[in-house]
């Protein structure tokens, strides 16, 4: 084995290095500590690392402290009161178990669901469909309105997958069913924490969605989606595909690297041929080059490469199906003691039977929706051109009856902490006073054109930051066919529908001058649809006592830059362009120590105003403001109260 050579660490003594490293100070301290230790007669005069770290950082020295023994486990609790059905309230009592309680997660299983059987319509009939839209099964020879003659039009019925259905058949089809996006978030309409009949904190489903948009890190989003019932896409790939490599360094030539470096005819520089040959070797796609001389080689004027296409698909609760299997949901609670173990509540400080979690559940219609199970197929041939035919589809969407969805396994998992009796007694005997952060929410309706201003009367106490969004009323309207997709989005959602029409041409010209005129086209039954969220706030302002804190800032500054700059890893920039953040703290959500606030209990003239081109008397919206408010929790005499109530 070879021995290692001598290693020499060279320390620069420039002006910047003297400030950053302070090598003279380090040497002086080591010498002084040695002299002091020798004067005390210590057998080992060398300084300790802790003494060195008083003035210098030692990156390779780890530290630890002994810690108070602690253990924890989750305890399942059933509802204390309330019928476990959708649309009702459930109240969970927090039992006297363990020394502290911290994390909480609700567990529910939504039963299987499906829509009812329906009769296939008779040709020529019309019926009022879902969302107030008239559904028509036209007669042959007429257009979609069943009134305008259209020669060559023939109509049949098919299911969403193109399989034929006989008109007039009893119990011939049924609609597909699917869940709303993030059903676990929407299931909890309101969550409240009460002690001795006093509400200490509460939040709505809007708060939960804003927390997800701003605070769930990307590397945990897949797990979060699994918990709240949101489908996760699966990646698929194609087989190997041959593609051409174009280097545009030399204009108008697809393979400039074939030019010899000594070619005097070239008019501009080009990529070195050895460089591209290393990245796209010919033997990766040419069998003859690889050693099979009996196979005809592939020849091309450009370099070639072999690649695959990547596509995504999903089959979760949001994918329409004839039968949706039972759906298990795990919903984390968002109170201050759930988020930070340092703020776990001493269980012994509040008597059993006086602390409750109350949850208002959403109704079934908010969670599950139908998708058309029947389509009208128009097949039209062009008179005089029997080889030319166009095929189009329109949905026949009549609401069915979805079975009542059961709600089982209703449990609240409570994380209980256990400590030694000595520590337990300290918390029993002493009054505890701690800084906490609670939710303050205000939802205000608006229908003013172009500009509006709202007093934030529901906000109080010191506010560190606010999540803000203007949600169109249409997003949660029963008349919106996509409300189960749009309900959590803070902007107007439009659909970009891809219409890939498949063409087939049959050439029958008998002269070179004649162009083929027999071309058929077939549209997809369910074209690919991309939802696009359009932000509806142009500029936003915040004022307090007439003083502009934010004066007509563009919405993108609050939706993209503020969450990008502030919050460290605790805040992320949301995908929703209509979700905005305004912070009065330098480090929102980063640490327990407050770093800035505005006390709106003192600054009561606290307004938010905005400019918009969307909102009007018909296109109304709701301003949603979720604020993080500082308060103080006082635990004494078997009760928990907030220091400030107004």
UniProtKB/Swiss-Prot annotation:
Its main location: virion. InterPro entries: MCP_C, MCP_C_sf, VP_dsDNA_II. It is a peripheral membrane protein. The keyword Transmembrane does not apply. Induction: Expressed in the late phase of the viral replicative cycle. It is found in: Virion; Host endoplasmic reticulum membrane; Host cytoplasm, Host cytosol. One of its GO terms (molecular function) is structural molecule activity. Keywords: Capsid protein, Host cytoplasm, Host endoplasmic reticulum, Host membrane, Host-virus interaction, Late protein, Membrane, Viral attachment to host cell, Virion, Virus entry into host cell. SUPFAM superfamilies: Group II dsDNA viruses VP. Pfam families: Capsid_NCLDV. Belongs to the NCLDV major capsid protein family. Homotrimer. The membrane-bound form, but not the cytosolic one, assembles into large complexes. Interacts with the minor capsid proteins M1249L and p17; these interactions form a rigid zipper structure that stabilizes the capsomers. Capsid protein that self-assembles to form the pseudo-hexameric capsomers of the icosahedral capsid. The capsid is constructed of 2760 pseudo-hexameric capsomers and 12 pentameric capsomers, with a T=277 symmetry, about 200 nm in diameter. The capsid encapsulates the DNA-containing nucleoid, the core shell and the inner membrane. Plays an essential role in virion assembly. Involved in virus attachment to the host cell. This is Hexon protein p72.
